[in-house]
């Protein structure tokens, strides 16, 4: 057995197991030389910077926040593997704005989980939680109560001037009576929604919709559907209670309605879950926890501050890193490609492998080890490849095996050379629920029989004695006797199940006999309901194949139901 076949067989065996433990291996350092990891860090860092620039300059990004955040986490891991400092939070925000903000936009650090939240809250007091509204960050500047500037966030220091769009956004007061002589507010322009439930509907592209309306040269009718959520009042009142009350009086009601005091991390957990499921007038992607005490505005910088933190909702899209690529040969001779990924948990299910279909499909995806893909769970919890979101810079060439000689009627026996993978797949199917459904008999057992040369064809196991079965390492006499009895009882399985177990391409009635079915002509098969000419030819080829005839003759000698000779 060559190395390729051994690799295929061993992977086929483990792919039939269920993952019941483990952890998402995001903290694993890649097994790369120092020169390569340096190249990969640089490439990923540049890509993240491009996406960040698109987000802050254009209001949207080619990737979702979920994808960006997870790839940013991956960059941190790679940097730590080389002993490099984490620069992701302190790196200046890219942007090309020309208008200076009176007070810089600080941005938010992201808390990874409840443990990180608890750690950050420890020792802090006067904390409040708000929904993290998913919109376009802006600065509002009022002089003597009159709105004089509406600036985009830009790079946090300078932004674009959108003041001419402000009169078309009814949610923004154009004049505030009794306002401070100089009033600077920071907040989020968002698309007004009618009872939006984040848990059910997700982001619905709301932020990009608002950004597009703001960036148009002429005013868009959509601006009338834009709301504003004020989340920062630099150099404003010292208490949050006073801030939200005054904001409401000035014409910004959402901040008061959606700001809640919290005493412990459990309060934050409760509000986060509530807002995730409750009908809201805006799209959200998490919550923000902030403390009342904050520095004077002149000390704010365009990097995340320490007085507020974001705790985002669980990602809607899950990234997995491709660890290896395996090629498996199924019982019908069709090859499939299975991606082995670093373990990832989706909806309480651990994912380690993803079947992506044919070799042709794999080539179309252009996936190599080290690439990062997005996964989702399809029907019955089966993982599905959605997209490739990041390709490693150095791509190792992988050559798929040549399976041209394999087909639906090949490898009913262990030999000739190269048949082991398909032969093993046939045995797994035979003992599985689609075949004879022999409990406790799977790929591992069949591989042991093949390895010890105790089986050479698809039904040779019927000749095994308890002593031969017990000779397999790890199988004692008691279990060997149980397996032997299971094999003997399999002889009484219905004829139709035996045909399915052998690979017959059509279900037949339970009371049929081999010799009766064998006498049917091609035209008789073709006229049967649900078969047709093409399926009839497949059936005829199956009956006429010498290996199938040999299997039937053997089953006849074993007095298997339906295969007995009749007078």
From Swiss-Prot:
An example molecular function term from Gene Ontology annotations: DNA ligase (NAD+) activity
First-level EC class: ligase
Keyword Nucleotidyltransferase attributed: no
GO biological process, alphabetically ordered: DNA repair; DNA replication
SUPFAM superfamilies assigned: DNA ligase/mRNA capping enzyme, catalytic domain (SSF56091), Nucleic acid-binding proteins (SSF50249), RuvA domain 2-like (SSF47781)
EC number: 6.5.1.2
Signal peptide span: none
Key word NAD present: yes
Gene3D superfamilies: 5' to 3' exonuclease, C-terminal subdomain, DNA ligase/mRNA capping enzyme, Helix hairpin bin, Nucleic acid-binding proteins
Reactions performed catalytically: NAD(+) + (deoxyribonucleotide)n-3'-hydroxyl + 5'-phospho-(deoxyribonucleotide)m = (deoxyribonucleotide)n+m + AMP + beta-nicotinamide D-nucleotide
Key words of the record: DNA damage, DNA repair, DNA replication, Ligase, NAD
InterPro entries according to UniProt: DNA_ligase_B (IPR020923), DNAligase_adenylation (IPR013839), DNAligase_N (IPR013840), NA-bd_OB-fold (IPR012340), NAD_dep_DNA_ligaseB (IPR050326), NAD_DNA_ligase_OB (IPR004150), RuvA_2-like (IPR010994)
Catalytic site positions: 132 (n6-amp-lysine intermediate)
Function description: Catalyzes the formation of phosphodiester linkages between 5'-phosphoryl and 3'-hydroxyl groups in double-stranded DNA using NAD as a coenzyme and as the energy source for the reaction.
Similarity comment text for this entry: Belongs to the NAD-dependent DNA ligase family. LigB subfamily.
Alphabetized PANTHER family for the sequence: DNA LIGASE (PTHR47810), DNA LIGASE B (PTHR47810:SF1)
UniProt protein name: DNA ligase B
Organism whose genome encodes this protein: Yersinia pestis bv. Antiqua (strain Angola)
Gene name tied to this protein: ligB
